[in-house]
């Protein structure tokens, strides 16, 4: 039943966790554990994969994305009762012996398991602390004295996933696992020829804070023949084979013997990396310090509290509050670090860093970590050419050639990112920093973003709209410009917004240049004269001159982006803007978000030679609920002061709410973070979500919530507060850290008019200005809604 989600999971808001009551979810429900250099993704059932900096070239262990059993690889802990011989796992998998009592939980940067079986209790905390190591910290106890063995194992593979798939027959001769008696640790070394960065490839260690009694480095020695992780031969024998490995199938395994009482015993297992020329001993000494794991776990758990100091909200809608304070910030943080490289849906092999993806991820991170955001923008600018275009994907860690594919939108996102920095810090210093051009030379940040605008202006089509080039944000439109003539309405709207931001920057720095005004005027005229179609803006113009998104077309007659971005860019008059969004919402709202387009594209549309779709009707980009695009619709509704409509769309898209509508099994993906897309009502398996975690939805949903629904928007001159909360809320409280001051903002909506501001009070005194900026460490703001 759709309402029976509590059999699967529930939220513990006092702990800021999601609790899982069973291990066998319809798909692995992941979490990310990281210190920014060492990463692990881990599921509710303990399946996991770790990597150091890059999952493409420094992967630690195997993870079989498409094989059965699903989620069948990870760092596994086995509990064996020496008397009875029974074996089980606190994660349930891989032995699948169901504990008498069990749950797992994901929090911000950690995952934990609680399991009780046959009188033995295990509490396991999984996290990555300050050092580059995954820590499995266990407290184990028993009702009566018990003798047990704990086996910990992690199958290793070649660090380069694609090389392993293609050349493992030869390359697996170039690895080893050796045991060191002095440090009681296993070390893995990968030294295959022609690695991308061989001098920086780390060694991997496996150890614990307790002396082992046996170990293995050979998979065959630990597993035996024709067995899997459910029944390794070493567990039957009661000991590992004490094997080393010099070429072959690698695996870390260690055995620890414990005598249990009702007083918990601690065992911490470590899987981490260290430098090629370094000794592992100093790192192990640190990890093995008394109470080290306990202290590090507390520090990791405190990360969310530190993040909440920058932004948090207290509102009547607790599902929305949870997303605002915990899981949306978590997802946005992971996207900033990982981009779109690796998840349960992405194998981490060829994606690298995407220009448009990373530039949008920055937008939500500026609030939390301005220096890291500036550094990321400079990295992205280094992929721009002197002409203004950018590489599409690039590989700063892997050091291989970028994907040059010329997309019409990539470079414009850089303008928004640089503008965001200026608005957050209130300084223009960043504009004067320099970044190289990919094809030689260097320029200031300002010069780079000017070239971004210039490149679009230099590539206009027959009708004066920007050429689609390889595609715009919507990859499905790649065939629109196959012959070099197709044009993008969406990019025209992006250009208008970029020029408005550039114009504001010019005003701030005192640069007298009317170029942005001229571009805005030309593009707005074309958008209104040529692209307006009764009650909507068309989406694109094909090579043949077909207006894609024309209301009379049998497919794709309405696209959400060219309506929402008309509002976001402010490219037309209020009447048209209201009309196009009214058309979009009334046509596209399916009850769990807005469809990306309607009707879905069909095969051979508009012709066999120029077919647009690569997905089934109602699936993914072809008329599914594409969550990223919905964030812009929410922003547009707020800009039009349609507060209740904005709230409705936001609520519909909360994953937990969709689960309550369709049920856990049908929704399939995690109910605590956003997926990229959800199947539309007309599709088979309607309501099924796909491609979770890594999505631009994370960044833009935070912006939609913080800056538009709550209305707390950073501007160069200060905070501009224009809430657009639902009329039904009586009040809301937002905390926002801005330029050294912690603002507590009370939104008083007693009047039930959540889209307008009647009065503003700063520290108890009436404030009539437009921008709020305090030099004190704290400030209180009270916004009274209502008509003036």
Language-model-detected regions and their locations in the chain:
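C-terminal beta-strand-rich structural cap/linker in extracellular carbohydrate-active enzymes
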Residues: 772-788
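Catalytic cores of carbohydrate-active enzymes
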Residues: 153, 391-392, 494-610, 651, ...
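Carbohydrate-binding/catalytic loop surfaces
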Residues: 343-351, 392-410, 438-440, 444, ...
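Active-site acid/base region of carbohydrate-active enzymes
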Residues: 314-329, 368, 377-389, 413, ...
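Anionic coordination/interaction segments
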Residues: 1-357, 371, 376-380, 420-424, ...
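Aromatic-rich carbohydrate-recognition surfaces in CAZymes
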Residues: 263, 353, 357-358, 362-464, ...
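Surface beta-strand/loop "capping" patches
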Residues: 714-745
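Short strand-turn-strand beta-turns centered on an Asx-Gly dipeptide
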Residues: 761-765
């Amino acid at each position: 039943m759709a309402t029976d989600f509590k059999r699967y999971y529930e939220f513990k808001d006092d702990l800021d966790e999601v609790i899982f009551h069973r291990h066998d979810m319809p798909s692995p429900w992941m979490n990310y554990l990281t210190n920014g250099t060492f990463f692990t993704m881990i599921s509710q059932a303990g399946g996991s994969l770790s990597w150091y900096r890059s999952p493409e070239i420094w992967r630690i262990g195997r993870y079989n994305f498409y094989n059965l059993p699903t989620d069948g690889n990870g760092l596994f802990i086995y509990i064996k009762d020496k008397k009875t011989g029974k074996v089980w796992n606190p994660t349930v998998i891989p032995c699948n012996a169901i504990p008498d009592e069990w749950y797992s939980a994901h929090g911000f940067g950690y995952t934990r398991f609680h399991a009780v079986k046959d009188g033995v209790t295990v509490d396991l905390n999984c996290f990555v602390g300050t050092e580059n190591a995954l820590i499995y910290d266990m407290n184990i106890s028993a009702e009566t004295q018990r003798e047990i063995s704990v086996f910990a194992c992690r199958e290793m593979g070649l660090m380069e996933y694609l090389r392993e798939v293609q050349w493992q027959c030869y390359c697996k001769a170039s690895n080893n696992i050796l045991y060191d008696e002095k440090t009681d640790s296993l070390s893995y070394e990968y030294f295959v020829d022609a690695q991308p960065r061989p001098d920086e490839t780390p060694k991997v260690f496996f150890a614990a804070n307790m002396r082992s009694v046996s170990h293995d480095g050979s998979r065959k020695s630990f597993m035996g023949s024709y067995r899997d992780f459910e029944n390794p031969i070493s567990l039957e024998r009661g000991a590992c084979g004490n094997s080393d490995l010099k070429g072959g199938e690698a695996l870390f395994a260690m055995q620890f013997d414990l005598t249990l009482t009702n007083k918990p015993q601690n065992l911490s297992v470590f899987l981490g990396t260290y430098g090629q020329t370094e000794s592992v001993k100093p790192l192990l000494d640190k990890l093995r310090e008394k109470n080290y794991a306990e202290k590090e776990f507390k520090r990791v758990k405190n990360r969310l509290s530190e993040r909440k100091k920058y932004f948090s909200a207290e509102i009547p809608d607790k599902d929305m509050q949870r997303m605002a304070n915990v899981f949306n910030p978590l997802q946005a943080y992971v996207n900033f670090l990982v981009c779109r490289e690796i998840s349960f849906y992405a194998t981490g092999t060829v994606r690298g860093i995407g220009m448009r993806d990373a530039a949008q991820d920055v937008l939500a991170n500026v609030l939390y970590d301005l220096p890291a955001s500036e550094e990321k923008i400079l990295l992205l600018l280094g992929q721009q050419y002197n002409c203004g275009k950018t590489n599409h994907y690039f590989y700063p860690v892997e050091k291989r050639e970028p994907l040059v594919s010329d997309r019409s939108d990539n470079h414009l996102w850089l303008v928004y990112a640089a503008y965001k920095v200026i608005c957050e810090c209130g300084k223009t210093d960043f504009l004067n920093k320099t970044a190289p051009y990919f094809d030689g030379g260097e320029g200031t940040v300002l010069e780079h973003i000017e070239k971004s605008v210039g490149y679009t202006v230099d590539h206009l089509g027959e009708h004066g709209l920007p050429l689609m080039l390889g595609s715009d944000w919507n990859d499905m439109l790649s065939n629109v410009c196959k012959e070099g003539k197709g044009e993008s309405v969406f990019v025209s709207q992006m250009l208008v917004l970029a020029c408005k931001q550039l114009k504001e920057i010019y005003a701030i720095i005192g640069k007298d240049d009317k170029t942005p005004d001229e571009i805005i005027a030309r593009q707005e005229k074309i958008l209104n004269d040529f692209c307006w179609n009764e009650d909507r803006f068309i989406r694109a113009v094909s090579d043949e001159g077909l207006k894609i998104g024309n209301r009379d077309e049998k497919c794709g007659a309405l696209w959400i982006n060219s309506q929402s971005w008309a509002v976001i860019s402010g490219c037309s008059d209020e009447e048209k803007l209201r009309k196009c969004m009214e058309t979009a919402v009334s046509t596209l709202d399916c009850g769990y978000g807005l469809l990306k387009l309607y009707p879905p594209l069909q095969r051979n549309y508009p012709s066999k030679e120029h077919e647009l779709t690569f997905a089934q009707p109602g699936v993914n980009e072809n008329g599914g609920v594409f969550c990223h695009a919905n964030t812009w619709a929410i922003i547009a509704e707020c800009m039009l002061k349609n507060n209740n409509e904005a709230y409705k769309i936001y609520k519909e898209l909360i994953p937990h709410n969709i689960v309550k509508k369709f049920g856990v099994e049908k929704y399939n993906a995690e109910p605590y973070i956003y997926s990229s897309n959800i199947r539309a009502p007309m599709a088979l398996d309607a309501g099924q979500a796909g491609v979770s975690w890594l999505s631009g939805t994370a960044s833009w949903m935070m912006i939609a919530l913080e800056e538009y629904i709550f209305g707390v928007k950073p501007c160069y001159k200060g905070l501009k507060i224009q809430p657009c909360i639902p009329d039904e809320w009586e009040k809301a409280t937002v905390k926002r850290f801005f330029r050294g001051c912690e603002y507590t903002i009370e939104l008083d909506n007693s009047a039930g008019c959540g889209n307008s501001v009647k009065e503003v009070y700063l520290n108890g005194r009436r404030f009539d200005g437009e921008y709020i900026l305090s030099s004190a460490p704290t400030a209180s703001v009270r916004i009274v809604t209502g008509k003036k």
